[in-house]
Swiss-Prot record:
Belongs to the XseB family. Keywords: Cytoplasm, Exonuclease, Hydrolase, Nuclease. GO terms for biological process: DNA catabolic process. Gene3D superfamilies: Exonuclease VII, small subunit (1.10.287.1040). Its EC number is 3.1.11.6. Heterooligomer composed of large and small subunits. The gene is xseB. It holds the Pfam family Exonuc_VII_S. This is Exodeoxyribonuclease 7 small subunit. The keyword Nuclease applies. Bidirectionally degrades single-stranded DNA into large acid-insoluble oligonucleotides, which are then degraded further into small acid-soluble oligonucleotides. InterPro entries: Exonuc_VII_S (IPR003761), Exonuc_VII_ssu_sf (IPR037004). It is found in: Cytoplasm.
């Protein structure tokens, strides 16, 4: 990564900001091929890190407080992704 922090040390918000910056650079279209590949690899690493952080949060939210204060399982219904 070009930043001083390693990807493991980035917060979710920092990683998303980095990913948005990479997307903006690639969308400009004036990036040499080799640099575009480097940006793409960095973006994929940031995307993976964000996904892993979200999965970790989902596991933490596996139990939420019910109205009476007891813990209850929490499940997220995923949207239909359609054809990939």
């Amino acid at each position: 990564m070009t930043e001083t922090k390693k990807s493991e040390e980035l917060t979710f918000e920092e990683a998303m900001k980095g990913l948005e910056g990479i997307v903006a650079k690639l969308e400009e279209g004036d990036v040499p091929l080799e640099q575009a590949i480097n940006y793409f690899q960095e973006g994929m690493a940031l995307s993976k890190m964000c996904h892993e952080k979200l999965q970790h949060v989902e596991k933490q939210m596996d139990f939420i407080l019910k109205d009476n204060g007891e813990l209850a399982p929490f499940s997220v219904q995923e949207e239909d992704e359609g054809d990939k």
